[in-house]
């Protein structure tokens, strides 16, 4: 549509038609024919309207603001109608009055400031929930509930106003929808501008808050660097409309900064934190300025951990909506080349790697990691800064940034099975040392971080976290060696002439598993790492004292460090179970294979125990996306062992699966990757014909019901998880009768190695996980030794209420999956019989088998190994220690 109106005619049928009869003579003269003839021609030609408000101009739709303010479109959209100052005539175009009403002083001043703030509101207050604001920058939810009154149902607001975080004011809508008790008649239908109107007070509020900004170059707070002049004016307006130039309210900013300090900076120390906080604290630019791009990236990374009440106060309905909003702001600033400092670009891009939305997103975690590494190489971050003349403080910062790149690169390779971006031989930056970290107390006059944050004021805690970060960097070196020893780059999808661009480069186990010496060397390296850990990094069972006095961040980082360690062990030993093909002779001894099975199973149990402890202490919500990376493989191992013929083994596996699922449920509230993992596991359980409710015996259920209230395992349902309906949920199905499956005659696929996880009929070696009465970790409560689970309140139906899981979207999810998690390239539905063939491994040219066949084949393959020892234990094996 063109922003034009028929000359001399009323506006088209719309809300504006109610005010068409009040056009003044002066306005009619302005709209007369250019010839000056007072008589209107029979056929008129369209021409541009004399004026159009900012909203209609941006949308390129017809505006009738000359007939009365607000225009009809703005009234329908419930937004403020603002007319910008003319750029041609350099004079103010005031909001038109109706029925000859004189223009108010407020309108004159509003038009004066409208050019610098088209939305009519303070940039700092753009995200503040207000009854007059219909703008929010997050966009994950649909606009279906934008206006529910029947009088407005037929009008679809513009996408500018259809944002997920939008929360309309019910009081305002009641006023808009009521007139003398008639809900179908809006208040503007009669005498809009001659009676006190809701819009008057809203415009007054917006007008007052907009006075503080004089021009488009002064919209950012003083502590943020202004926009570069190379960004065009229309691009600046676009960034304003999208909210990229806005910052949240001060309470939300401060809460996000505290969350960043406590739960992001410890494992990614890529900034001089005290200097950064000092700049923000003054807010006047006297201590310097920081990058808006980096600031938005910091708030995005912190939005995963900040208390939800601050996000709700900021106008966000869900944590996912808040994370998406902050990420979109950050990405827009990157796309429009706001930042030119390459070091700052590397810092912010590293934080952007924590975004993951859909599996088919081309610019996913791996993409942003690649951009960050490329920029890091261009400025020489991969070289030893000690050989340069830069200041010592800068050398330390560069070392921390480089090792942050290295650690993130290795964890992405471990979690996504993507090739590493950094090669071990391509850098010479020495290992981090404690002196490389910024360990100092925050200035007393800094009020950005509240006094309740102990970390920035406790040197011992900072020192512990620095040592943990060093240990994590050393572990990532071991991860690099593990990937090199056991995995290679393969094309995940079979290349097809008509579909050659959808293949994904992935890491998969080496075809020839004759590298026993290499695996043993890496295994010894990992054990040496664990034995040499400093005292503060050594694993210990979490207690309530670990979450007091602000020490929860140390508990989370220490536990996550060991979860990554056991995930690395699992990834190292999984390919050792079977030869590359069952037709070939084993390339490793049976004892080596058996030991690898036990190592993988023991790693899964350690991960499960740690996840349970985090859940009991309510710390699982502070896990980064790496939490999905470390928990999913443990759950799949439990899933495979649920087909074990031994009841005790099935109960143990089901118990561990449920414990991990509770943590995964919590992660679903934050990360989309956890959504896909949950749907994947539910489909896998269905295809494997596993009834999780029937797998737990009455004795276990009785023991699991002894739960103190303070550590109930009840998990609230996720806020946005539409995957499967209640009727379709696996856990709502009735238990099926057990049907013995014949041993399959077809041979297993080449990559079914992980299907042969330890599924023996005997119990595994005792670990601390099984020393408690129900096989769980002892209570973290000092006053009780009861098992900390509540079956009555337990969220076992983890897919209840969700829509059908979309397998067509699963094409490379951000999970820790390897050879048996090869998602089908074309996507499959829950009705496909060969689903688990892709789960357990699919050969390129070999036939597949059903889920039950694959799992039963794995059990039969282990029968002789189990029979060799009466207790099911490999000769010479020592029970695993905690």
From Swiss-Prot:
Protein species of origin: Fusarium vanettenii (Neocosmospora pisi)
Any Gene Ontology CC annotation: nucleus
Residue stretches of biased makeup (Low complexity): 1-20, 130-139
Keywords: DNA-binding, Metal-binding, Nucleus, Transcription, Transcription regulation, Zinc
Gene name in the database record: CTF1-BETA
Name of the protein in question: Cutinase transcription factor 1 beta
InterPro entries, sorted: Fungal_Detox/Toxin_TFs (IPR052761), Transcription_factor_dom_fun (IPR007219), Zn2-C6_fun-type_DNA-bd_sf (IPR036864), Zn2Cys6_DnaBD (IPR001138)
Main subcellular location of this protein, as a coarse class: nucleus
Region feature (Disordered): 1-49, 117-148
Entry's localization field: Nucleus
Entry-linked PANTHER family: FARB-RELATED
Molecular function terms, GO-annotated: DNA binding; DNA-binding transcription factor activity, RNA polymerase II-specific; zinc ion binding
Ranges of the DNA-binding region feature: 53-81
């Amino acid at each position: 549509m063109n922003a034009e109106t028929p000359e001399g005619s009323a506006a088209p049928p719309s809300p504006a038609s109610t005010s068409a009869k009040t056009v003044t003579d002066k306005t009619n003269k302005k709209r007369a024919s250019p010839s000056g003839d007072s008589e209107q021609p029979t056929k008129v030609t369209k021409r541009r309207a004399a004026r159009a408000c900012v909203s209609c101009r941006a949308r390129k739709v017809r505006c009738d603001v000359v007939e009365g303010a607000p225009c009809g479109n703005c009234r329908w959209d419930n937004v403020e109608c603002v007319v910008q100052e003319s750029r041609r005539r350099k004079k103010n175009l005031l909001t038109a009055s109706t029925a000859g009403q004189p223009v108010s002083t407020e309108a004159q001043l509003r038009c004066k400031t409208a050019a610098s703030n088209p939305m009519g509101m303070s940039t700092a207050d753009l995200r503040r929930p207000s009854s007059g604001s219909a703008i929010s920058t997050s966009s994950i939810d649909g606009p279906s509930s934008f206006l529910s009154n029947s009088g407005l149902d037929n009008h679809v607001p513009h996408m500018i106003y259809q944002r997920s975080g939008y929360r309309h004011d019910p009081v305002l809508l009641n006023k808009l929808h009521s007139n003398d008790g008639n809900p179908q008649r809006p208040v503007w239908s009669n005498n809009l501008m001659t009676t006190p109107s809701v819009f008057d007070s809203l415009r007054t509020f917006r007008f007052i808050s907009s006075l503080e900004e004089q021009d488009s170059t002064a919209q950012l707070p003083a502590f943020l660097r202004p926009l570069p002049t190379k960004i065009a004016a229309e691009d600046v307006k676009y960034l304003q409309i999208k909210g990229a130039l806005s910052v949240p309210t001060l309470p939300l900013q401060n809460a996000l900064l505290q969350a960043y300090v406590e739960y992001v900076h410890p494992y990614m120390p890529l900034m001089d934190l005290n200097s950064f906080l000092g700049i923000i604290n003054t807010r006047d630019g006297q201590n310097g300025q920081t990058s808006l791009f980096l600031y938005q990236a910091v708030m995005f990374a912190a939005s995963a951990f900040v208390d939800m009440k601050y996000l709700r106060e900021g106008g966000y309905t869900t944590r996912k909506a808040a994370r998406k909003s902050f990420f979109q702001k950050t990405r827009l600033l990157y796309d429009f080349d706001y930042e030119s400092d390459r070091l700052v670009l590397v810092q912010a891009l590293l934080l952007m790697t924590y975004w993951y939305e859909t599996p088919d997103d081309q610019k996913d975690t791996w993409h942003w990691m690649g951009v960050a590494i490329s920029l890091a190489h261009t400025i020489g971050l991969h070289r030893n800064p000690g050989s340069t003349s830069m200041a010592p403080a800068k050398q330390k910062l560069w070392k921390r940034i480089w090792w942050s790149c290295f650690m993130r690169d290795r964890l992405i390779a471990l979690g996504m099975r993507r090739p590493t971006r950094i090669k071990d031989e391509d850098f010479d930056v020495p290992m981090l040392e404690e002196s490389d970290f910024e360990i100092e107390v925050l200035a007393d006059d800094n009020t950005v971080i509240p006094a309740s944050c102990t970390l920035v004021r406790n040197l011992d805690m900072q020192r512990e976290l620095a040592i943990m970060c060093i240990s994590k960097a050393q572990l990532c070196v071991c991860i690099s060696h593990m990937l090199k020893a056991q995995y290679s780059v393969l094309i995940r999808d079979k290349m097809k002439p008509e579909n050659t661009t959808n293949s994904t480069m992935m890491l998969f186990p080496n075809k020839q598993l004759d590298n026993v010496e290499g695996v043993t060397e890496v295994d010894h390296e990992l054990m040496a790492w664990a034995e040499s850990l400093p005292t503060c990094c050594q694993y210990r069972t979490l207690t309530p004292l670990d979450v007091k006095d602000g020490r929860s961040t140390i508990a989370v980082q220490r536990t996550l460090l060991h979860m990554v360690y056991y995930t690395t062990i699992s990834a190292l030993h999984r390919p050792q179970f079977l030869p590359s093909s069952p037709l070939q002779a084993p390339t490793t001894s049976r004892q080596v294979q058996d030991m690898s099975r036990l190592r993988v199973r023991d790693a899964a149990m350690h991960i499960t125990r740690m996840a349970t402890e985090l859940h009991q202490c309510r710390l699982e919500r502070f896990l980064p996306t790496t939490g999905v990376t470390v928990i999913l493989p443990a759950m799949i191992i439990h899933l495979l062992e649920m087909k074990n013929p031994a009841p005790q083994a099935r109960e143990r596996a089901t118990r561990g699966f449920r414990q991990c699922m509770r943590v995964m449920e919590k992660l679903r509230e934050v990360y989309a990757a956890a959504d896909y993992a949950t749907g994947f596991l539910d489909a896998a359980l269905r295809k494997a014909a596993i009834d999780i409710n029937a797998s737990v015996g009455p004795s276990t259920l009785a023991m699991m019901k002894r739960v103190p209230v303070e550590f109930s395992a009840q998990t609230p349902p996720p806020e946005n998880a539409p995957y499967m309906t209640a009727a379709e949920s696996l856990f709502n199905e009735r238990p099926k009768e057990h049907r013995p499956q014949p041993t399959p005659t077809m041979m297993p696929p080449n990559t079914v190695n992980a299907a042969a996880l330890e599924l023996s009929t005997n119990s595994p070696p005792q670990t601390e996980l099984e020393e408690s009465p129900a096989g769980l970790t002892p209570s973290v409560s000092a006053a009780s030794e009861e098992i900390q689970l509540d079956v009555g309140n337990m969220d076992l139906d983890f897919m209840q209420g969700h829509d059908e899981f979309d397998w067509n979207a699963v094409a490379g999810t951000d999970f820790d999956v390897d050879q048996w998690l090869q998602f089908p390239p074309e996507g499959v539905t829950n009705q496909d019989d060969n689903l688990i063939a892709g789960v357990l491994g699919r050969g390129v040219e070999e036939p597949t088998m059903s889920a039950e066949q694959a799992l039963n084949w794995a059990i039969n393959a282990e029968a002789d190994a189990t029979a060799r020892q009466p207790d099911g234990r490999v000769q010479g094996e020592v029970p695993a220690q905690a």
